[in-house]
């Protein structure tokens, strides 16, 4: 399945099969016909009221109106910026300062934040869609125009707006539709906030292939009793998730192919897929295809992927991050020089996946983006190596610490801890003293055990861990928790854990 234009591919379903379901809520099912009608109306309103090319903000949660605004903005030649409702006020203010949007579609009530942008309330948005004024033909979208802007965290505390073009998105969607078992009309679970680019992995492959999205409300995601009561009734076929969230799901004994028999495809992105998690999924969902993918926001969601099978798990000690998509090249570099095949270095991505850089931030763009072999390239900050065309992840460069002179990859310890029989899930963070790493602290979700005292459990974990890592990699302190904290994007909240251990 190959598409030539994102907007036309989505609109085709609205014209060909207007009654086909596109967005399935608990009490309402929206159709492709409604999506086309509403997005056309929004595009017409934008064309009439603001100059082409200026970004617009779409503020809300997982709602149909968000989709209509995304598509309407794109049709009219505007990049959209998704901001999740309840985002901290200070972060919203910083995004507005950087982005200078012309208009804000407030699908949820807009907070008391001053802005020069015109604010379109949900009531006014509904009126725009209901009136559906006849507009002139829309100017065709150019592939280099920006499709969306997603703001990621910046090292200085100011968010960076990653600009993804129509061409970037088209390349990604065609790859997912071709390589990951997606067929026409599949039903996707919509879980990730639209302000997180993981959502792009379900949103656009679903819409361009005539599929449907079933949004999962936050209150359901955070209430596992409700989630696992509801899940078998939804007939979900494709689930895009972070490994951390899936780890929590796998704690539920009934989360398997027998009780949730509709699932056909799992897609993972956003962080490393632990081998223990992958093994559980292979064992529990023999009927499903499981894919591990890799890529930063700056390279349009993901650029490499591999199907996770028992044979793959038997061959590799760590789940590979896959083979690189055809229109993209990965270089392994140290100090901007390519290393020998099989050596570890920084993963540098070049080609069709690489974004246009950071919005209104030439300094940060110049630091991370450059031209290499005639192609746009991006320094990921991830360590890895290429072996026989397979990309192997070796952790974040900025998750590497030095303790007593040894360079330690924290995610490597996480990986080995997750393989200890007493451990369900773990995250290791450094504790600092006078700007130097004093010790390693492990936060652990433990499996059921017979130890009466925590120190005996810790002793047993250390003994088993010592069989696979060097002594200097064994955490000095263990903190036992019922659940590791997650960010809004579903990743382990390492910053929060670091703040906790370094607050005392």
Features from the language model and the residues they span:
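Conserved pre-ATP/AMP-binding loop-to-beta segment of ANL
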Residues: 135-151, 158, 182-188, 194
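Conserved AMP-binding/adenylation subdomain of ANL enzymes
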Residues: 160-189, 197-237
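Gly/Ser/Thr-rich phosphate-binding loop
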Residues: 209-211, 236-240, 250-316
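AMP-binding/adenylate-forming domain of the ANL superfamily
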Residues: 1-149, 164, 275-278, 326-329, ...
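AMP-dependent adenylate-forming
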Residues: 5-7, 104-139, 169, 289-292, ...
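Conserved AMP-binding
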Residues: 60-63, 84, 182, 192-196, ...
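ATP-dependent adenylate-forming carboxylate-activation enzymes
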Residues: 41, 60-64, 78-97, 108-110, ...
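Conserved AMP-binding A3 loop
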Residues: 31-33, 147-174
């Amino acid at each position: 399945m190959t598409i030539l234009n994102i907007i036309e591919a989505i609109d085709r379903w609205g014209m060909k099969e207007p009654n086909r379901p596109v967005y399935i809520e608990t009490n309402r099912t929206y159709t492709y016909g409604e999506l086309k009608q509403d997005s056309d109306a929004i595009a017409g309103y934008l064309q009439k009221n603001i100059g082409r090319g200026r970004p617009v903000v779409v503020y809300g949660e997982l709602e149909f109106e968000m989709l209509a605004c995304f598509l309407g903005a794109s049709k009219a030649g505007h990049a959209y910026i998704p901001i999740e409702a309840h985002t901290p006020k200070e972060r919203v203010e910083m995004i507005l300062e950087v982005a200078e949007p012309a208009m804000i579609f407030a699908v949820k009530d807009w907070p008391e934040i001053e802005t020069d942008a015109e604010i379109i309330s949900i009531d006014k948005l509904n009126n725009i869609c209901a009136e559906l004024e006849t507009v002139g033909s829309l100017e065709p979208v150019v592939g280099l125009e920006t499709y969306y802007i997603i703001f990621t965290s910046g090292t200085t505390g100011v968010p960076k707006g990653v600009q993804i073009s129509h061409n970037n998105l088209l390349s990604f969607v065609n790859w997912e539709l071709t390589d990951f078992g997606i067929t026409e009309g599949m039903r996707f679970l919509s879980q990730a906030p639209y302000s997180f680019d993981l959502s792009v992995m379900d949103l656009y492959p679903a819409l361009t292939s005539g599929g449907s999205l079933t949004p999962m409300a936050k209150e359901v995601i955070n209430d596992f009793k409700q989630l696992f009561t509801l899940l078998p009734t939804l007939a979900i076929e494709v689930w895009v998730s972070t490994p951390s969230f899936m780890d929590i799901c796998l704690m539920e004994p009934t989360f398997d192919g027998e009780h949730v028999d509709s699932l056909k495809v799992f897609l993972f992105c956003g962080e490393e897929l632990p081998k223990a998690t992958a093994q559980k999924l292979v064992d529990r969902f023999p009927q499903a295809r499981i894919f591990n993918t890799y890529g930063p926001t700056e390279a349009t969601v993901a650029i490499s992927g591999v199907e996770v099978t028992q044979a793959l798990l038997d061959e590799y000690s760590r789940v590979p991050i896959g083979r690189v998509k055809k229109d993209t090249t990965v270089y392994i570099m140290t100090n901007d020089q390519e290393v020998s095949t099989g050596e570890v270095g920084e993963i540098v991505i070049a080609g069709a996946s690489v974004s246009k850089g950071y919005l209104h931030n030439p300094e940060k763009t110049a630091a991370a983006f450059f031209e290499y072999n005639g192609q746009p390239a991006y320094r990921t900050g991830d360590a890895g190596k290429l072996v026989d065309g397979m990309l192997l992840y070796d952790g974040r460069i900025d998750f590497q610490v030095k303790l007593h002179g040894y360079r330690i990859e924290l995610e490597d310890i996480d990986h080995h801890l997750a393989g200890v029989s007493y451990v369900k899930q773990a995250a290791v963070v450094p504790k600092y003293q006078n700007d130097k790493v004093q010790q390693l602290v492990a936060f652990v979700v433990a499996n059921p055990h017979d130890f009466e005292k925590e120190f005996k459990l810790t002793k047993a974990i250390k003994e088993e861990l010592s069989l696979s890592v060097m002594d200097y990699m064994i955490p000095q302190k263990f903190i036992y928790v019922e659940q590791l904290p997650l960010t809004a994007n579903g990743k382990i909240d390492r910053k929060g854990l670091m703040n906790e251990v370094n607050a005392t």
